[in-house]
C-alpha cells in the first residue's frame, strides 16, 4: 500500500516540497498499480493531500474498482481539540475533499498529540464517534493510527478496531511495535506497518540520508545502517529491498505502507518487493542487533 503524506507538500517534515502536478501524477500511478490501498489523512499538508487525491478521483470518474481509501480523523491543529464534534467535522471535510461518499478504512489519528485524552476516550468522545460513523455506513472499517505503542495497546484492548497503523517502530533498526503487533494479530486486528524505511535512511542509504524517524541521526545511530549496507553489498541486495521485505515477510502484518513522491517510485517499490534475497543474506541480517525504544520519543511534531 502507498502513503501520501509527502504528497500534501510537507517540507517541515520531509525537507522538500512536492508540487501539485507531480503529486497528481504519483496518485495516478498508485491507482494504476497492482496495489489496492492508498493512505492519507485530513491533516497531511493541512488537507492538501486529500484534496489532490480527490481531484484525481474526480478526473478519473471515480475511485478504481476494489480500491480502498484509508484516511484519518484528525484533531484541530490550532487548538489541539479532538472531541466528537471535531471528529464529525473531520470526516465531513475528508468526504468533501476526496470526492467520495464513504471511506473504506477510517482511522482515529495521533491521539497522543491531542489536548486532552479524555476527549477521545470518554463515552461521548471522538472514539465513540468513529464507531458511530461505521454504524452509519460512512466508514466500512475503522482503525487507530498513531505512534506511541504503549498507549496504542491500551486503546485497542478497549475498542473493537478492524485495523491499526503504526509507523517507524517495526523496521530493520527498531522493534518497538513487536508486542503491539502480536496482540493485534492474535485478536484479528489487521496490521498496516508504515515507514519500513525508517523515514528515509533505509531507502537512500547513509551516503544520501541521515534521517531516522524524521530526525537527523547521530554517527552512532547510523552504525547499524552501515552494518546493513555491508551485508547488502556483500550479496548484491538493494538496502530498500531488504527493509521492505523485512516487513512484508512478517506473517502478522497485513499490509506494508510506503510513502511515495514520484510516479516512478510506485513501480520501483513493487519491484523491490519482488527482488530475490538469498537466505544467507537474511541469516546475517537477522543476527544484527536492533533497538526496542520509541524511536520518536524526542521528535518535535511538525504538521507541515
Please report, for each region that a protein language model flagged, where it lies by residue.
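N-terminal binding-site loop/beta-alpha segment at the start of enzyme catalytic domains
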Residues: 1-67
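Structural motif corresponding to the early beta-alpha repeats
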Residues: 60-81, 109
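Active-site mouth loops of central-metabolism enzymes
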Residues: 7-21, 73-86, 117-118
Amino acid at each position: 500500500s502507498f502513503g501520501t503524506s509527502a504528497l500534501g507538500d510537507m517540507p517541515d517534515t520531509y525537507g522538500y516540497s512536492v508540487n501539485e502536478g507531480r503529486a497528481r501524477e504519483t496518485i495516478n500511478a498508485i491507482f494504476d498499480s497492482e496495489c489496492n490501498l492508498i493512505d492519507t489523512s485530513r491533516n497531511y499538508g493541512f488537507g492538501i493531500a486529500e484534496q489532490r487525491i480527490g481531484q484525481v478521483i474526480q478526473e478519473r470518474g471515480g475511485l478504481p474498482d476494489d480500491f480502498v481509501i484509508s484516511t484519518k480523523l484528525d484533531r484541530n491543529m490550532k487548538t489541539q481539540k479532538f472531541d466528537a464534534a471535531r471528529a464529525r467535522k473531520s470526516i465531513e471535510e475528508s468526504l468533501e475533499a476526496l470526492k467520495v461518499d464513504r471511506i473504506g478504512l477510517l482511522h482515529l489519528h495521533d491521539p497522543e498529540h491531542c489536548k486532552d485524552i479524555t476527549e477521545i476516550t470518554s463515552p461521548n468522545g471522538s472514539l465513540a464517534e468513529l464507531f458511530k460513523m461505521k454504524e452509519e455506513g460512512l466508514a466500512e472499517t475503522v482503525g487507530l493510527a498513531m505512534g506511541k505503542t504503549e498507549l496504542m495497546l491500551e486503546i485497542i484492548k478497549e475498542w473493537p478496531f478492524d485495523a491499526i497503523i503504526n509507523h517507524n517502530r517495526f523496521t530493520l533498526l527498531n522493534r518497538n511495535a513487536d508486542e503491539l503487533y502480536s496482540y493485534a494479530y492474535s485478536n484479528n486486528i489487521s496490521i498496516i506497518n508504515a515507514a519500513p524505511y525508517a523515514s528515509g535512511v533505509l531507502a537512500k542509504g547513509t551516503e544520501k540520508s541521515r534521517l531516522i524517524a524524521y530526525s537527523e541521526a547521530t554517527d552512532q545511530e547510523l552504525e547499524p545502517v552501515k552494518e546493513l549496507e555491508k551485508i547488502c553489498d556483500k550479496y548484491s541486495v538493494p538496502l530498500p529491498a531488504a527493509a521492505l521485505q523485512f516487513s512484508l515477510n512478517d506473517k502478522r502484518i497485513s499490509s506494508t505502507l510506503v510513502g511515495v513522491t514520484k510516479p516512478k517510485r510506485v513501480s520501483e517499490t513493487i519491484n523491490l518487493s519482488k527482488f530475490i534475497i538469498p537466505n544467507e543474506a537474511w541469516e546475517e541480517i537477522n543476527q544484527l542487533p536492533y533497538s526496542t525504544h520509541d524511536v520518536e520519543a524526542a521528535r518535535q511534531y511538525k504538521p507541515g
